[in-house]
C-alpha cells in the first residue's frame, strides 16, 4: 500500500505457487486484458495506458454499495475499492468509482507492460461473426485464443445455439455441473 504522499505503508513479498494450469491462467488474463482493451475500462485506461496491455475487472455489489476494480500490470496486482463505512449505497459502480481511482494510481505509479506468452495447447483461432471457428480464411472477424490440443479438429464446428429463456446457454451450465 502506498499513501497519497508516496510513502510505502505496507509491502509484501509472497512466494508464488502454481494454483491453476498455465493455460487457465493465460485465458483468464487474456479475458481481463479485453476488459481494458474493449470493455468497461477501455475508455478510462485504453487511450492513456494501452501500450502496457493491462488486465482488469470491474465490480459492483448489490444496491451499488461498493465499487471495485482489480488492475494487473507486469509487476503488480492492484485492488481498489470505494464505498461507505456504513454499508449504505455509494452510488458508484466499478467503472465510475474504483476504476477512476486505479487510473489516478497509475498516473503516479507508471505500470510495467503485461505481455502474455501463450503456453502450450493455446491456439489462435479465427472466428466469424456468428462465433464459429473458421479455418479457410473466409468471413473472419477476429482471432481468439482457444485451449485445445487439436485446433484443426475445431475447424467448421458451429457455435452452440443459445437456448431460449435461460440466463446462460445450456452448454455453459453443463460445463460447471460436471
Model-predicted regions and their roles:
Residues 23, 27, 40-44, 171:
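Exposed alpha-helical structural elements
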Residues 31-59:
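Active-site Gly/Thr loop motif
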Residues 1-36:
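Extended, non-catalytic substrate-recognition/exosite surfaces adjacent to catalytic cores, especially
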Residues 2, 7-16, 50-178:
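Soluble, non-transmembrane domains of envelope/secretory-pathway proteins that act on or interact
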Residues 26, 36, 44-45, 103-107:
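Glycine-rich loops and low-complexity Gly/Arg-rich segments
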Amino acid at each position: 500500500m502506498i499513501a497519497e504522499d508516496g510513502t510505502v505503508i505496507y509491502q509484501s513479498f509472497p512466494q508464488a505457487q502454481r494454483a491453476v494450469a498455465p493455460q487457465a491462467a493465460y485465458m483468464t488474463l487474456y479475458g481481463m486484458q479485453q476488459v481494458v482493451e474493449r470493455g468497461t475500462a477501455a475508455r478510462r485506461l485504453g487511450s492513456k495506458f494501452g501500450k502496457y496491455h493491462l488486465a482488469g475487472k470491474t465490480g459492483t455489489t448489490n444496491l451499488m454499495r461498493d465499487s471495485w476494480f482489480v488492475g494487473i500490470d507486469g509487476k503488480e496486482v492492484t485492488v481498489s475499492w470505494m464505498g461507505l463505512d456504513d454499508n449504505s449505497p455509494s452510488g458508484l459502480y466499478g467503472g465510475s468509482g474504483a476504476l477512476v481511482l486505479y487510473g489516478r494510481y497509475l498516473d503516479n505509479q507508471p505500470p510495467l507492460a503485461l505481455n502474455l506468452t501463450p503456453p502450450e495447447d493455446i491456439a489462435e483461432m479465427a472466428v466469424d461473426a456468428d462465433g464459429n471457428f473458421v479455418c479457410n480464411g473466409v468471413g473472419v472477424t477476429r482471432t481468439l485464443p482457444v485451449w485445445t490440443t487439436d485446433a484443426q479438429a475445431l475447424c467448421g464446428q458451429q457455435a452452440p445455439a443459445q437456448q431460449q429463456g435461460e440466463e446462460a446457454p445450456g452448454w455453459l451450465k453443463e460445463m460447471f455441473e460436471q
